From Swiss-Prot:
This is Der GTPase-activating protein YihI. Residues 156-165 have a biased composition (Basic and acidic residues). Residues 146-155, 166-181 have a biased composition (Acidic residues). It comes from Vibrio vulnificus (strain CMCP6). A GTPase-activating protein (GAP) that modifies Der/EngA GTPase function. May play a role in ribosome biogenesis. Residues 32-43 have a biased composition (Basic residues). It comes from the Bacteria.
Length: 181
């Protein structure tokens, strides 16, 4: 069969029966919007340069040159660090004592020791160091009470040094019959 050429005459086969006519400007606007949406699917290009635009939105109205540094004055003479006063040292010692008393790890280890558990060498050393520091801080702050051992030594009767004659007299007066059963 031979091929038929399409004709351009109206009313030819395959041609729509009615034509839809649109306003040209409306069609142009719709087409541009579709094209715009299609173009802007990804991220914006030029990530290096976008920082300047973001800074202008957030920053002040004055444009700053990033090459200029800080205007803060730097002292040319180094002043020695000031020493803490007695009250400041005492306050810091109180704070350190408070921290040590509230130390969760130390409290857990002390509870384990009280329950009769033996700690490893490292943990025992940690506990000893912390307790020594607590004792040192308490004595520094004047919170440490005298220990019981010191009280016993003070309560012991004080004996006068006795001469040899007194000791010999006690020995001679000693009665062995009192101890026989």
């Amino acid at each position: 069969m031979s091929r038929k050429k399409k004709s351009r005459k109206p009313g030819a086969a395959g041609a729509p029966e009615f034509m839809v006519t649109r306003n040209r400007s409306e069609s142009d606007v719709a087409g541009r919007l579709r094209k715009k949406d299609k173009k802007r699917k990804g991220l914006k290009a030029g990530g290096r340069n976008s920082e300047e635009g973001a800074q202008q939105k957030h920053g002040s109205s004055q444009v700053r040159d990033p090459r200029l540094g800080s205007k803060k004055k730097i002292p040319l003479i180094v002043e020695p660090a000031k020493k803490l006063t007695k009250q400041e040292r005492r306050l810091s010692a109180e704070q350190e004592l408070e921290m040590l008393e509230n130390d969760a790890k130390l409290n857990v280890l002390l509870d384990r020791i009280e329950s009769g558990e033996n700690l490893g060498r490292g943990l025992q050393q940690y506990v000893d160091e912390k307790l020594d520091r607590i004792e040192q801080l308490m004595s520094q702050l004047g919170l440490l009470e005298p220990e019981a051992e010191e009280e016993f030594e003070e309560e012991a009767p004080v004996r006068k040094s006795r001469s040899d004659d007194d000791l010999l007299a006690d020995f001679e007066d000693f009665d062995m019959d009192d101890y026989k059963g």
